[in-house]
From Swiss-Prot:
Assigned keywords, A-Z: Cytoplasm, Metal-binding, Nucleus, Zinc, Zinc-finger
PROSITE patterns in the cross-refs: ZF_FLZ (PS51795)
Molecular function as annotated in GO: kinase binding; zinc ion binding
Compartments where found: Nucleus; Cytoplasm
Signal sequence annotation: none
GO biological process, one term: response to starvation
Function: May act as an adapter to facilitate the interaction of SnRK1 complex with effector proteins, conferring tissue- and stimulus-type specific differences in the SnRK1 regulation pathway.
Chief localization: nucleus
Species the sequence originates in: Arabidopsis thaliana (Mouse-ear cress)
Ranges where the record places region Disordered: 54-93
Protein name (record): FCS-Like Zinc finger 3
Assembly mode: Interacts with KIN10 and KIN11 via its FLZ-type zinc finger domain. Interacts with KINB3 via its N-terminal part.
Effect of residue 47 to S: Abolishes its ability to interact with KIN10
């Protein structure tokens, strides 16, 4: 489907093995290709490592924000539980 739409728009999507996913350098026929996550090709180990570090930083940031959201959510639930109002009859002797 993607090729149909890219052809329809008048531009073809380049094959993922034609250029480096990071620096966009052309990957030659007889050159080494460094792969990452199965569908990302890189011209050098340095470009590949830079992408890995970038992805790991994004993942750490996502995990940190996810933990923060869970913590805020549980604190809100705890504070709501602490403000419970009980109704009923009070008997004083």
């Amino acid at each position: 489907m993607a090729s149909y739409y890219s052809g329809f728009l008048g531009c073809e999507e380049p094959h993922f093995l034609e250029s480096c996913s990071l620096c966009r350098k052309h990957l030659g026929l007889n050159s080494d290709i460094f792969m990452y996550r199965g569908d990302k090709a890189f011209c050098s180990n340095e470009c590949r490592e830079e992408q890995i570090e970038s992805d790991e930083a994004k993942e750490r940031k996502w995990k940190k924000s996810s933990r923060s959201l869970r913590k805020n959510s549980s604190e809100t639930k705890e504070s709501a539980a602490g403000n419970t109002v009980r109704t009923g009859t009070l008997v004083v002797a």
